[in-house]
């Protein structure tokens, strides 16, 4: 009975604290209105609920059956978000709760509450996040995190067709804009009625804090400019990053680079990503200590990491900003033909930085990862980008998250790895592989040559381990200075050029 499901959702709101007992009748009536129902029959006995996903499915199935909601994956997501939006407190209440906890209990208590809240509202869909495949691979650079992302919804054919027919809109300008808060969504833009953001001031400018709905790692947050302004790595970027970790010292925060290929998927809206997680790069030791003249008070060095990373640590955050700006300025204009590093070609700039900030033992710390997006006929997607032989696993941009040591791999790999596992166990000749596995053929032959012991019992851990080592190669390809004698000498030449 649909009245039972409505009461279950009301009870869920009460149990999670999204609504208060005084709100019960009002919220129930708002849910009835959203469902386009006029009647409610109170359940005869106390209503218990199993899980939120089941409650929402019952309600959406009913709405679809009555023609209130279209029957495709996107329309269903739009509708169940509308239902959760009824339970979600208004922004002013959420912000007041956050600020009260921040002032009285501290920054971690505030983010703990906001992270749970963002899950309770179903903005972060816990039941989808659980579907992601995750494991750790031990490498020469530490333990790399690998995930095959299954929680980001893939549109079904009906939803894709509907999105093509949907009228185009420039509001909100992108999925990061503050105007998404409370937005109902459409076939080509996700619903955000259950989405709330926390205003922040960093570097005397208006920014906001939210969580990523896809949670690639613990407390994966997004910090974004209140204005729809493009990504730009500059002196002010370092100031903003350090201001943020000053406000939330338990979180790290970093920025994608500001150039295509080496940047993230969204270059049009200035934003950072952070969270409560320690990546392999953060754990990596200093390989070579370096002292910058005039900055003897700043601990500096090259990190033992496949991507070219300079680590700076100092109790005085302004000194870090000053030195980081010098390094950025030097790198923007730096060329070294022997390492195939060119600051620009045909007027197109190539050099930039992926910066990450954190607090370490009471001091401020910046990791500056040197990036270059030059392309050639041999490497049309980028010289310092995963090379073609690795594209069967990872072809996409190497953004901030990958730079730090977490591979976010496409969902297609789940099915392909299951099929490849069967083919490997049965020793199927690669020439007989189906078309979708052909891209893995050379890799599969190499795996079998190195793992003659491969069988049905160990094939899956072996494949996971091999994927992890491919990711280590991906990071090596993306590093501008290789971890060999020539690369190390080239890195030292650049550091010596910073004045």
What positions do the PLM features span?
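Catalytic or ion-translocation cores adjacent to nucleophile or general acid/base/metal-coordination motifs
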Residues: 236, 245, 249-265, 274-328, ...
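Histidine-centered divalent-metal-coordination microenvironment in nucleic-acid enzymes
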Residues: 219-225, 263-279, 369
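Active-site microenvironments that recognize anionic phosphate/pyrophosphate groups
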Residues: 1-223, 227-230, 304-306, 320-324, ...
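Hydrophobic faces of well-ordered beta-strands that scaffold small-molecule active sites
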Residues: 209, 253, 270-272
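Beta-rich nucleic-acid/ligand-interaction surfaces
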Residues: 260-268, 346-352
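Helical scaffold of the NTase/Pol beta-like nucleotidyltransferase catalytic core
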Residues: 194-198, 226-253
């Amino acid at each position: 009975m649909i009245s039972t499901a409505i009461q279950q959702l009301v009870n869920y709101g009460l149990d999670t604290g999204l609504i208060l007992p005084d709100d019960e009748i009002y919220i129930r009536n708002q849910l009835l209105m959203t469902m386009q129902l006029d009647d409610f029959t109170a359940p005869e006995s106390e209503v218990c609920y199993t899980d939120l996903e089941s409650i929402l499915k019952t309600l959406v199935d009913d709405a679809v059956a009555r023609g209130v909601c279209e029957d495709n994956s996107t329309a269903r997501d739009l509708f169940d978000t509308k239902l959760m939006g009824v339970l979600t407190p208004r922004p002013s209440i959420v912000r007041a709760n956050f600020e009260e906890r921040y002032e009285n209990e501290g920054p971690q208590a505030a983010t703990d509450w906001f992270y749970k809240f963002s899950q309770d509202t179903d903005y972060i869909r816990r039941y989808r996040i659980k579907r992601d495949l995750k494991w750790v691979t031990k490498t020469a650079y530490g333990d790399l995190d690998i995930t095959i992302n299954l929680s980001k919804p893939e549109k079904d054919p009906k939803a894709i067709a509907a999105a093509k027919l949907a009228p185009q809109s420039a509001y909100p300008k992108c999925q990061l804009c503050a105007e998404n808060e409370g937005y109902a969504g459409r076939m080509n833009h996700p619903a955000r009625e259950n989405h709330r953001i926390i205003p922040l001031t960093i570097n005397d400018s208006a920014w906001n804090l939210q969580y990523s709905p896809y949670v690639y790692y613990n407390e994966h947050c997004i910090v974004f400019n209140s204005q729809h302004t493009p990504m730009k790595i500059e002196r002010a970027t370092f100031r903003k990053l350090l201001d943020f970790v000053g406000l939330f010292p338990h979180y790290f925060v970093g920025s994608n680079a500001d150039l295509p290929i080496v940047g993230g998927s969204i270059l049009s809206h200035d934003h950072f990503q952070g969270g409560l997680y320690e990546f392999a790069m953060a754990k990596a030791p200093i390989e070579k200590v370096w002292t910058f003249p005039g900055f003897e008070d700043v601990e500096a060095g090259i990190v033992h990491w496949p991507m070219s990373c300079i680590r700076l640590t100092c109790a005085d955050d302004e000194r870090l900003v000053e030195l980081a700006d010098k390094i950025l300025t030097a790198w923007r204009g730096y060329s070294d033909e022997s390492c195939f590093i060119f600051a620009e070609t045909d007027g197109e700039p190539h050099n930039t930085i992926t910066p990450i900030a954190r607090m370490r033992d009471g001091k401020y710390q910046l990791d500056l990862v040197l990036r270059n997006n030059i392309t050639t006929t041999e490497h049309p997607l980028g010289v310092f980008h995963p090379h073609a032989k690795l594209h069967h696993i990872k072809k996409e941009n190497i953004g901030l998250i990958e730079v730090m040591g977490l591979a976010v791999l496409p969902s297609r790999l789940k099915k392909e790895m299951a099929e490849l596992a069967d083919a490997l166990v049965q020793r199927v000749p690669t020439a007989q592989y189906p078309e979708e596995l052909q891209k893995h053929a050379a890799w599969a032959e190499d795996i079998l040559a190195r793992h003659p012991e491969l069988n049905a019992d160990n094939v899956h851990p072996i494949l996971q381990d091999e994927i992890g080592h491919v990711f280590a190669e991906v990071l090596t390809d993306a590093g501008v200075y290789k971890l060999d004698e020539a690369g190390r000498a080239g890195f030292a030449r650049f550091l010596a050029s910073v004045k």
